[in-house]
Amino acid sequence: KFIESLIVGYEVSSRLGTASRPRKNVHSHGHWGTPGAAVAVAKLSDYSANDMRSIINISTSMSPANSWTPCFEGATIRNAYSGRSGFQGILAVHMYEAGFTGIHDAPSDIFGSILGDAFEPDKAVLGLGDIYRIQQPGP
């Protein structure tokens, strides 16, 4: 069950990343990890697909906005981006349990207009069910 949850979280993160075009000045480490972590926790907790949709919308609204400047200046805060993303994903599930709601289509809003220049939902679901992204070789 843990491995399945991990794979589902990775799949969501990867697919959101594929569908997004981050702004040039935005460091994307952590963006897609927040909903990925949230989905992994939700899957591990046996939430329904409808619950996960709500959790994705909450967690996407919590995705960190990071710039590239710390990388260029050598600031070590950049090392916390991915970990903070995981923490916020876990927090999103607890917030859902406490009754918080997100906007209807947070990925399109957050990744398509705030952290990015475009979000293409069709790319997020292209080939869904054919092969898991974790099985695909890198570039």
Which residues fall in each region the model found?
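A glycine-rich phosphate/pyrophosphate-binding beta-strand-loop-alpha-helix module
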Residues: 1-38
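Functionally critical mobile loop/hinge segments
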Residues: 28, 32-34, 39-139
